């Protein structure tokens, strides 16, 4: 089924992954993107485009595993918003780790240059665009 391999342009699912120390999982992109107001998007929460044959939670799980090698369980949706420039719906999921260690090698080195655990207060320094207010509240920042 070819449609199963095709990505949807409707949803981007991102994971807000916390470890036992309360640190947040972040990725540094290989290719920096230009955001609104000239901001350069380099660091992001792991995640990506939803395929037609998967749920939002399945997408978040797959993308986080592919980008970071961490196996996670999405436990609840934090926020949903429409991106103003590219007209996609961005869904933020709070995720817990199924294992504190990576269970696989990251499969997307062409997209992800670095994987890093950071303290919640460091997220604002890494995210150069507007941080979703519900995500900020969830992280306590």
Regions found by a protein language model. Name each.
Residues 1-25, 46, 80:
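Conserved N-terminal beta-strand and adjoining loop/helix that marks the start
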Residues 17-18, 26, 95, 117:
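Conserved hydrophobic "DFG−1" position in protein kinase catalytic cores
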Residues 23-66:
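Conserved Nudix-box catalytic region and its N-terminal flanking loop in Nudix hydrolases
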Residues 48-73, 79-134:
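Unchanged
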Residues 134-141:
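Short, surface-exposed polybasic-and-hydrophobic patches located at secondary-structure transitions
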């Amino acid at each position: 089924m070819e449609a199963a391999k095709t990505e949807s342009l409707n949803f981007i699912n991102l994971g807000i992954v916390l470890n036992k120390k309360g640190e947040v999982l972040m990725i540094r992109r290989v290719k920096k993107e230009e955001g609104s107001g000239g901001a350069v998007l380099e660091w992001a929460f792991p995640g990506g485009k939803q395929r037609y044959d998967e749920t939002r939670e399945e997408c978040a799980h797959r993308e986080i595993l592919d980008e970071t090698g961490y196996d996670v369980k999405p436990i609840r949706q934090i926020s949903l918003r429409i991106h103003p420039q590219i007209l996609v719906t961005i869904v933020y999921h709070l995720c817990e780790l199924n294992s504190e260690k990576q269970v696989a090698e990251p499969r997307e080195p062409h997209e992800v240059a670095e994987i890093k655990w950071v303290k919640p207060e460091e997220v604002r320094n890494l995210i150069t665009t507007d941080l979703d207010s519900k995500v900020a509240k969830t992280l306590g920042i």
